[in-house]
A protein has these predicted regions:
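Short, well-ordered beta-strand segments in beta-rich or mixed alpha/beta enzyme
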Residues: 2-9, 41-71
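Short alpha-helical
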Residues: 13, 64, 76
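Short amphipathic alpha-helical segments
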Residues: 14-40, 78
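Glycine-rich loops and low-complexity Gly/Arg-rich segments
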Residues: 28-34, 62-66, 80-85
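Glycine-rich beta-strand-turn "strand-cap" elements at beta-sheet edges
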Residues: 39-52, 79-94
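Intrinsically disordered, low-complexity terminal tails and linkers in eukaryotic proteins, enriched
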Residues: 68-80
C-alpha cells in the first residue's frame, strides 16, 4: 500500500471557495474512483501566517492505483483548480 500526500497552501482570499471545492467536488470524485481511504487535514505551522495549509492523503493499494492518482486525478485537479484559483493555491505531492 502507498500513501500519496498532497500539501496545499491556500491564500485567504480564496480559502472558503477552495475548501468547498475540495470537500464537495474533489474528495467525492476520488472516492467515486475507488479511493475510499482519504484523509484531509488542516496543518498548523508557525511559518504559515499568511496562508492556510492542508494535507490530503490518499491510500493507493498498488502501483497502478498510485499512477492513476498521480498521473490522471491530480492532472484533473490541476486543470480545474488552476482555472478557478490560479496561483492563489499552491500544491505539491510528496
Amino acid at each position: 500500500m502507498y500513501i500519496v500526500n498532497t500539501s496545499f497552501m491556500v491564500e485567504p482570499s480564496v480559502h472558503d471557495r477552495w475548501l468547498k471545492f475540495v470537500t464537495e467536488k474533489y474528495i467525492p470524485a476520488l472516492r467515486a474512483r475507488g479511493f475510499g481511504k482519504v484523509v484531509f487535514t488542516r496543518v498548523l505551522s508557525v511559518d504559515a501566517e499568511d496562508h492556510f495549509t492542508y494535507s490530503l492523503q490518499v491510500n493507493a493499494d498498488d502501483m497502478e492505483a498510485y499512477r492513476l492518482i498521480v498521473d490522471e486525478l491530480f492532472a484533473e485537479y490541476a486543470a480545474t483548480a488552476g482555472a478557478l484559483f490560479g496561483q492563489r493555491v499552491l500544491w505539491f505531492n510528496s
